[in-house]
Amino acid sequence: MTEAASEGTESFAFGAVVERRDELDGRPWISYPVRVVADTPELVAVHLSHGTRLTFGDDPFSWGPHPWQLFGDRWQSAGILQLHRPGRGHSVWVLRDADTGAFREWYVNVEAPWRRTPTGFSTLDHEIDLVVPADSRTLRWKDVEKFEERARIGHFSPEEATAIRAEAADVAREIAAGEQWWDTRWSRWEPPAGWNALLQSFETEGS
C-alpha cells in the first residue's frame, strides 16, 4: 500500500470532489476543493479550478497566516493540474497562461508527501520550489531563502531540513537529466466540460 493510501481509505473516483489541504499545528492551515483526475499507486492528479474558494484556518499558527491569505479567498490564477507520486516529497503543478491557456511551465512544489484522509489529501508546503519553463530543461530555484530562514528558526528540525534539501536536489537532478517521473503529455491535458465551474467546498460539491 502506498503512503498516499496509508489511512486505509479507498481510491477516489475520477471527477470526485475532494479536499486538498495543508496541515500545520495539527489542523488545516489552508484547504480547498479539487477534482480527482487520477488516483493510482503511481500517480495522484487533481485539478484546481479558477475561482475556487480557499478556506484558511483561524490564527494563531506557529508559522503565521497562510501567505495566500493576502490575495483573498478565491484561486485567482488559471486552473491548474497538480501531479503527485505517492511517497515523494513534492507535487508538480502544470501552470498555464491566464490569457491564452497555453502551457507555461512545470512548477515543482516541495512539500510533505501527500497523506490520504477520508475527505481527500493532506500535506504541508516546504517553501522550496523549482520552476521549469515549457521550452527548457533549465530550472530556476525559488524561495530557498525562505526555507533556510524557517530551518534557522526551528520550523523544521535539522533532520527534516536535510531531507527537504535532498528531495529538492533529487528532483533537480532528475529534471536536468530528462528523467523526471511525470509524463510530459500532462502539459496538454484539458479539464472536461463543466469542470471550470466554481467550487465552493468539498462538502457541498462532493455530496
Curated annotation (Swiss-Prot):
Keywords: Antibiotic biosynthesis, Cobalt, Hydrolase, Manganese, Metal-binding
Cofactor section: Mn(2+); Co(2+)
Enzyme class: hydrolase
Listed GO biological process terms: antibiotic biosynthetic process
Description of how activity is regulated: Hydrolysis of (S)-HPP-CMP is inhibited by CDP.
Active-site residues (renumbered): K142 (proton donor)
Positions with a binding annotation for CDP: W68, R74, Q76, S77, K142
Metabolic or biological pathway: Antibiotic biosynthesis; fosfomycin biosynthesis
Residues that bind a divalent metal cation 1: N109, D125, D129
Catalysed reactions listed for this entry: cytidine 5'-({hydroxy[(S)-2-hydroxypropyl]phosphonoyl}phosphate) + H2O = (S)-2-hydroxypropylphosphonate + CMP + H(+)
SUPFAM superfamilies referenced in this protein's UniProt entry, alphabetically: FomD-like
EC number(s) given by UniProt: 3.6.1.-
Any one GO molecular-function label of the UniProt entry: hydrolase activity
Chain sites annotated for binding a divalent metal cation 2: E127, D129, D143
Outcome (variant: Y107F): 250-fold decrease in kcat with (S)-HPP-CMP as substrate. Does not affect the KM for (S)-HPP-CMP
Domain notes: Comprises a large twisted antiparallel beta-sheet with two additional alpha-helices located at the C-terminus.
Family as reported in the entry's similarity comment: Belongs to the FomD family.
Its job: Involved in fosfomycin biosynthesis. Catalyzes the hydrolysis of cytidylyl (S)-2-hydroxypropylphosphonate ((S)-HPP-CMP) to give (S)-2-hydroxypropylphosphonate ((S)-HPP) and CMP. Can also hydrolyze (R)-HPP-CMP and cytidylyl 2-hydroxyethylphosphonate (HEP-CMP), which is a biosynthetic intermediate before C-methylation, but the catalytic efficiency is much higher with (S)-HPP-CMP.
Protein name, as recorded: Cytidylyl-2-hydroxypropylphosphonate hydrolase
Species this chain originates from: Streptomyces fradiae (Streptomyces roseoflavus)
Encoding gene (name): fomD
